[in-house]
């Protein structure tokens, strides 16, 4: 999901427009001990079985949500509150940002995970860095919630690919996927995060990027990057699933102008399942069209013999009336194994969590419609 920073209630991060450097980035290793969470006694690693997901030994259809912001919270009680509410509501999967890239280190105590500056990549493992994600993983383990952890954003929110290009060079997003220096910095970060949580059963999947695309590129650019990067991750960690995080065909439905080929990506052995997003308002289509979008992706996944994750979907009004149709379409489509609405909202110690217009909050009528009732429908269908 692309969203405006002006809509975020969390403190925005300062990004400096540093001049590009042609040098190969130098990865600065962490000197802070990494308190890697211990796997929960009752949990097991998520896997797939044909076109289904298997969570803690249970094969079926699973509901979940997105809360990109949870790793940036500095109050542990807020993190626990979110997972308490999710678990009691029957939500099983939460997708979070495992990235927070800056070109200038914040001086106000804001959380950031990686600094790209002067051709160097420095991973922040301090209390305002990956230790915040550590607690998210720890709390997820405690509450039985599975996490999808994403490594970089296509969009500029929380740094994104442009934060890399400002530090290491590159003129457009195509350069990001093919520039050796950029990819060295990216892979160093991926390796650090994967190794940090490699033994955690709370991790559902590693995700390459949020909505990666390459406007005007041949599909081979993205495909080759997906193939190379997913193989790199599998070489580090064979225990966890790997997915792309693509919105599928970009902002222009059923076209390849964004350099994405959904069906072709499903053929990559080191990609375990498909992901796709749905925002008709942003794409100039009507809400009813969304059901076709869902069933077409389900068919592609079924043909490939891999599960589909309906990973993001949202509207800014009439949540229940519109999104309920999409949930039902996904639940009844052969090939879809889970759905994650965008996005989860809750009342934290500092006030409401971020609202980008698509958010609906725990305890609201919309939450009852799209979470409580949806979970009940899933449970009935499993009997």
Swiss-Prot record:
One Gene Ontology term, aspect cellular component: extracellular region
Pfam families from the UniProt entry: Cellulase (PF00150)
Residues that coordinate or bind substrate: 97, 210-213, 279, 283, 342
Top-rank taxon, per record: Eukaryota
MF (Gene Ontology): mannan endo-1,4-beta-mannosidase activity
Primary location recorded for the protein, binned into one broad class: secreted
Catalytic activity as recorded in UniProt: Random hydrolysis of (1->4)-beta-D-mannosidic linkages in mannans, galactomannans and glucomannans
GO biological process: mannan catabolic process
Active site per the UniProt annotation: 211 (proton donor/acceptor), 312 (nucleophile)
Subunit structure: Monomer.
Record-given protein name: Mannan endo-1,4-beta-mannosidase A
Organism: Emericella nidulans (strain FGSC A4 / ATCC 38163 / CBS 112.46 / NRRL 194 / M139)
């Amino acid at each position: 999901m692309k969203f405006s920073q002006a809509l975020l209630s969390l403190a925005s991060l300062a990004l400096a427009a540093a001049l590009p450097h042609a040098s190969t980035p130098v990865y600065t290793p962490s000197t802070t001990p990494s308190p890697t969470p211990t796997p929960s006694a009752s949990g097991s690693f998520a896997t797939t079985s044909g076109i289904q997901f298997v969570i803690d030994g249970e094969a079926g259809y699973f509901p979940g949500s997105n809360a990109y912001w949870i790793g940036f919270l500095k109050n542990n009680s807020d993190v626990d509150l979110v997972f308490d509410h999710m678990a009691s509501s029957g939500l099983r999967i939460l997708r979070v940002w495992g990235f927070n890239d800056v070109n200038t280190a914040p001086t106000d105590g804001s959380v950031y995970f990686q600094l790209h500056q002067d051709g160097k990549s420095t991973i922040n493992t301090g209390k305002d860095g990956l230790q915040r994600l550590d607690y998210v993983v720890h709390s997820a383990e405690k509450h039985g919630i599975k996490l999808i952890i994403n490594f970089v954003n296509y969009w500029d929110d929380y740094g994104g690919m442009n934060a890399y290009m400002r530090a290491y060079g590159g003129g457009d997003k195509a350069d990001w996927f093919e520039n050796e220096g950029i990819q060295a910095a990216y892979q160093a970060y991926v390796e650090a995060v994967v190794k940090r949580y490699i033994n955690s059963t709370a991790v559902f999947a590693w995700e390459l990027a949020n909505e990666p695309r390459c406007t005007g590129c041949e599909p081979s650019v993205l495909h080759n990057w997906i193939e190379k990067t997913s193989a790199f991750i599998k070489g580090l960690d064979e225990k966890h699933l790997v997915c792309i995080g693509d919105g599928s065909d970009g902002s222009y439905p059923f076209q390849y102008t964004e350099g994405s080929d959904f069906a072709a990506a499903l053929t990559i052995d080191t990609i375990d399942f498909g992901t796709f997003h749905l925002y008709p308002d942003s794409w100039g289509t009507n809400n009813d069209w969304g059901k076709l979008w869902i069933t077409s992706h389900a068919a592609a996944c079924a043909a490939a013999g891999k599960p589909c994750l309906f990973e993001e979907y949202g509207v800014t009004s009439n949540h229940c009336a519109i999104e309920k149709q999409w949930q039902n379409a996904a639940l009844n489509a052969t090939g879809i194994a889970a759905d994650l609405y965008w996005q989860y909202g809750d009342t934290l110690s500092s006030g409401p969590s971020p609202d980008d217009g698509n958010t609906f909050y725990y305890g609201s009528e919309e939450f009852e419609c799209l979470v409580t009732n949806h979970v009940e429908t899933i449970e009935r269908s499993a009997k």
